[in-house]
């Protein structure tokens, strides 16, 4: 028997439970993501983050509705490839790197510090989706420029990051510092002139 959930007089059929608080659901042949919150503060932070990210220009799954009483939200279900998984095969397409720099630029301009690690992004339909729905107050770009940006290229920092997550990657594919710095410099000039 198919389990159904009703939110604001709309019925959704549960297709799959993704984790403890997330479900893939379907309504009228379209897939959605149902997120349940058990903590009121976390739900309010999600609602605030969803709004701030949406108006900033950072692409994230569209939120169709949320129920403040139940602390549930219905979002677009994004099927695509996680950028960390894409990078494990060697390198990311230039289009993905362009979109990554744009996401950082939008965040910086709206004073939002988002977690720029590649496993927080999914590439689908020509868009780069930021999945966590979290942000901090932006103070400066040094952490991204000197740290996280190197995780978007096949660098020794990327290999170390993967190993810290228990992911085995081929260290022989590591790009030279010269090649990585050249790519970073070219992308930076393109977006920050």
Question: What residue ranges belong to the model's regions?
Answer:
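Conserved structural core of kinase catalytic domains
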Residues: 58-99
């Amino acid at each position: 028997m198919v389990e159904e959930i009703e939110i604001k007089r709309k019925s959704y059929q549960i297709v799959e439970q993704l984790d403890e608080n997330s479900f893939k659901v379907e309504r009228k042949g379209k897939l959605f993501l149902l997120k349940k919150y058990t903590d009121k503060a976390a739900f309010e932070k999600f609602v605030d983050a969803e709004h701030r990210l949406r108006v900033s220009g950072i692409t994230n799954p569209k939120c169709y509705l949320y129920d403040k009483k139940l602390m549930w939200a219905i979002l677009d279900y994004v099927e695509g490839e996680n950028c960390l998984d894409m990078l494990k095969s060697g390198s990311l397409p230039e289009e993905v790197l362009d979109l990554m720099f744009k996401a950082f630029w939008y965040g910086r301009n709206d004073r939002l510090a988002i977690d720029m690690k590649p496993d927080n992004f999914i590439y689908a339909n020509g868009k780069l989706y930021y999945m966590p729905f979290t942000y901090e107050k932006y103070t400066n770009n040094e952490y991204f420029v000197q740290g996280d940006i190197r995780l978007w290229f096949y660098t020794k920092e990327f290999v170390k990051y993967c190993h810290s997550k228990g992911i085995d990657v081929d260290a022989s594919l590591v790009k030279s510092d010269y090649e990585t710095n050249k790519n970073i410099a070219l992308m930076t000039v393109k977006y920050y002139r």
